[in-house]
Amino acid sequence: MARGNAPRDSYHLVGISFFILGLGTLLPWNFFITAIPYFQGRLAGTNSSAETMGTNHTSPTDTFNFNNWVTLLSQLPLLLFTLLNSFLYQCIPESVRILGSLLAILLLFALTAALVKVDLSPGLFFSVTMASVWFINSFCAVLQGSLFGQLGTMPSTYSTLFLSGQGLAGIFAALAMLMSLASGVDAQTSALGYFITPCVGILLSIVCYLSLPHLKFARYYLTEKLSQAPTQELETKAELLQADEKNGVPISPQQASPTLDLDPEKEPEPEEPQKPGKPSVFVVFRKIWLTALCLVLVFTVTLSVFPAITAMVTTSSNSPGKWGLFFNPICCFLLFNVMDWLGRSLTSYFLWPDEDSQQLLPLLVCLRFLFVPLFMLCHVPQHARLPIIFRQDAYFITFMLLFAVSNGYLVSLTMCLAPRQVLPHEREVAGALMTFFLALGLSCGASLSFLFKALL
């Protein structure tokens, strides 16, 4: 089936569905972070949020170092299960992986919500919470890898929509934090609301996924691509043909993607035997390794300081009043998530640098390492070793704006470029591999956050 015969995405329903699925994949992580005041209250042995809502989340009274541990234990299972998902995704049916993960996340969040009404000692509550974080993020890893694999077979616009949905999850979490601060409700009420909200979001994600087989546009890319006629012409872009010959992995007509333009005048290479089979993970890795490395470095920088360091920054105002209470939720969490979402959305309009700029992309990614010392030298009252150089609030706000936009844009850019660097039948593997490297970057950043916090 030629690309010109592809059906339209009526009412943008497929795009909306992937946007909501992207939202659902990051709701668990963001709502655990949003509920930090509740967790701090429980770990301090109190059910009242009156005192913990306005405190610094990483102050010396945080004996459990909750912020760092919840970040690390969210990313380690993501790394482990994404690795398994990258190599074993062909062994388990796609629908089982996606739907099963969504149902498991929903069940675990329901159990987490139930714990709000259960009295536990701080140590036991911390252990149960960390176990819940581990298992929820394990299923999130399988879910993300499977969905990115699907997106690898579709136009890059849908990858951008999915990533934008993930960015919106953080905005919801930040707004929930602000409403909780402004409402003055007790910790149990706010925590119950936190954990019911992602349950509703996961239910909506399940509905969206179940609706995809009933949408003609989704069937064309996700189902009918597997049953193309054997006489279908091969993709004939010169660079793809050269890459095919270089790696010795001939593409079969059954594996040709309907998303790319076909040249009716080009004949298949007669000397190349068409061998059915699944694409090699290592062949795909050789094609996308530089883009994957850039993705790792982007998230390493981001998670090494956010939120472990950035959440410690406070206003330098001599009489902060309410601004002191809302400074970090607005200037750290809300600003980051809004600008990160904006950065992810920019790739809907342009992709720069593109796949032909092999040196420029790594340079831009490496420049982000400058944000680590910049944030560490901001107004952090708990400084013991480093001086405070960037004392004014405007410095922190400017750094956060650039930090967040660059994170969102470079993440979305690398995820969109990777499928373009491989053959059509290798795109699903490329999507799964990029998800693994995404998790690797998150884990590296979460681990480094302990070191950078100790250096303060």
Swiss-Prot record:
GO terms for biological process: adenine transport; adenosine transport; cytidine transport; guanine transmembrane transport; hypoxanthine transport; inosine transport; neurotransmitter uptake; nucleobase transport. The modification Phosphoserine is found at S252. It catalyses: inosine(in) = inosine(out); adenosine(in) = adenosine(out); uridine(out) = uridine(in); thymidine(in) = thymidine(out). It is a multi-pass membrane protein. It is found in: Apical cell membrane; Basolateral cell membrane; Nucleus membrane. Residues 248-277 are annotated as: Disordered. The chain crosses the membrane at residues 13-33, 69-89, 98-118, 123-143, 161-181, 192-212, 288-308, 323-343, 360-380, 396-416, 432-452. Disulfide bonds: none annotated. Residues 263-275 have a biased composition (Basic and acidic residues). Its main location: membrane. Induction: By platelet derived growth factor (PDGF) and fibroblast growth factor (FGF). GO terms for cellular component: apical plasma membrane; basolateral plasma membrane; nuclear membrane; plasma membrane. Keywords: Cell membrane, Glycoprotein, Membrane, Nucleus, Phosphoprotein, Transmembrane, Transmembrane helix, Transport. Gene3D superfamilies: MFS general substrate transporter like domains (1.20.1250.20). GO terms for molecular function: adenine transmembrane transporter activity; cytidine transmembrane transporter activity; guanine transmembrane transporter activity; neurotransmitter transmembrane transporter activity; nucleobase transmembrane transporter activity; nucleoside transmembrane transporter activity; purine nucleoside transmembrane transporter activity; uracil transmembrane transporter activity. Pfam families: Nucleoside_tran (PF01733). Glycans are attached at N56. Bidirectional uniporter involved in the facilitative transport of nucleosides and nucleobases, and contributes to maintaining their cellular homeostasis. Functions as a Na(+)-independent, passive transporter. Involved in the transport of nucleosides such as inosine, adenosine, uridine, thymidine, cytidine and guanosine. Also able to transport purine nucleobases (hypoxanthine, adenine, guanine) and pyrimidine nucleobases (thymine, uracil). Involved in nucleoside transport at basolateral membrane of kidney cells, allowing liver absorption of nucleoside metabolites. Belongs to the SLC29A/ENT transporter (TC 2.A.57) family. Transport activity is insensitive to nanomolar concentrations of the inhibitor nitrobenzylmercaptopurine riboside (NBMPR). This is Equilibrative nucleoside transporter 2. The lineage of its organism: Eukaryota, Metazoa, Chordata, Craniata, Vertebrata. The gene is Slc29a2.
